[in-house]
Amino acid sequence: MSEGFTHLDADGAARMVDVGGKTKTRRLAVAACEVHLSPATMALLATAALPKGDALNTAKIAGIMAAKRTADLIPLCHPLPLAHADVRFDVDQAAAVVRVEAEASTVAETGVEMEALTAAMVAALTIYDMCKAVQKDIVVSQAKLLFKSGGKSGTFVSPDWPAGRPYPAS
């Protein structure tokens, strides 16, 4: 039953993978998602005029905090010593979309993809929370890993990585 699944034991029960024998390497991951708003809500967000305050600064802090707590939220994730975590936003007022991008890095035995994804998603959920008083039909979508480097599997670049954009320094 567990054949091919690293997080299942021989009986099919969940288990945490033993990474103790792996070599520590520098690992970096970039993840993204989108928050779709109405034009009216976007105008409030862009001018920091939402009733709850400045959504983007709050979301940035929430995303960074979430990256540091990923192992507490995702049951089989290893706690990692993060070297860096950041959250950035591309506010597209014309499309009424906030593109959230999160980056995390470490020197460890396992990757930081989940930390980057968690940071992006929690930042997006924080934007949702900050905007829900003025809009009920907000959509959070397109959560994905854009880039990862380090470790045995090497570098992954999503087809959605922007053309011409340099890869992060690993």
From Swiss-Prot:
Substrate binds at L76, C77, H78, M114, E115. The active site is at D129. The gene is moaC. It catalyses: (8S)-3',8-cyclo-7,8-dihydroguanosine 5'-triphosphate = cyclic pyranopterin phosphate + diphosphate. CDD domains: MoaC_PE. Belongs to the MoaC family. It comes from Solidesulfovibrio magneticus (strain ATCC 700980 / DSM 13731 / RS-1). This is Cyclic pyranopterin monophosphate synthase. Its EC number is 4.6.1.17. SUPFAM superfamilies: Molybdenum cofactor biosynthesis protein C, MoaC. It comes from the Bacteria.
